[in-house]
């Protein structure tokens, strides 16, 4: 089995190293095309206004000056001579749950793999802060992902569907199994931090504050809160079929879907 790995935290990220170790428990034909620099929050964006610079690090291991989406396209269309059987994107430093999936470059890697006709999974590891330092328990995903992926790889998923896997912030022996979930809802608490540079010119940082959520049973955020691995099937089709009739009636004609 041929596996293509990518991420959004960059080619030198600890999560990518963890993902490679996970992938090598499944296959010895593992390829990496990952961003040269951190591409977090760029979602499913393409580089259309500047060239893509590809750098070979070692055999089957490449860094690309581009987005996660660029990386998957280059991996499948340029770097690899034979299409991969599986695309794994991650392991992200931090969970990708609820509405955050729309921002995530990690999710985008799996989206692009799916669009290219390859079975794709996104993997993310929840973390905590201790004394101001980010502590990411990579051992959780490394312990539990291989067996989980072996089970999920044989699934007959519909076209346009991929899986979003989130691992809880706890010790490996505290993980309480895996749960199939739906997207939860977190309060939108994105803030703008206004600052001034040395010459008095303004600049800004975006940052997330504390985010409350309704930890409803069956959601991804509820699963993580209870030390469960969250497995959420996501799909490319964003159509809201529940309102097509109402929209059609508002326009004065029958539903078309």
From Swiss-Prot:
Where does the chain cross the membrane? none
In its keyword annotation, does this UniProt entry include Cytoplasm? yes
InterPro entries, per database record: SurE, SurE-like_Pase/nucleotidase, SurE-like_sf
The protein's required cofactors: a divalent metal cation
Query: Quick one: which residues bind a divalent metal cation?
Result: 8-9, 40, 92
Keyword set, alphabetical order: Cytoplasm, Hydrolase, Metal-binding, Nucleotide-binding
Pfam families with a match to the protein in the record: SurE (PF01975)
Q: Where in the cell is it found?
A: Cytoplasm
Q: How is the cofactor bound?
A: Binds 1 divalent metal cation per subunit.
Keyword Acyltransferase listed? The answer is: no
> Which Gene Ontology terms cover its molecular function?
3'-nucleotidase activity; 5'-nucleotidase activity; exopolyphosphatase activity; metal ion binding; nucleotide binding
Q: Name one GO cellular component term.
A: cytoplasm
So what does this thing catalyse? a ribonucleoside 5'-phosphate + H2O = a ribonucleoside + phosphate
- EC annotation? 3.1.3.5
Primary location:
cytoplasm
Which protein family is named in the record?
Belongs to the SurE nucleotidase family.
Q: What does this protein do?
A: Nucleotidase that shows phosphatase activity on nucleoside 5'-monophosphates.
What is the official name of this protein in its record?
5'-nucleotidase SurE
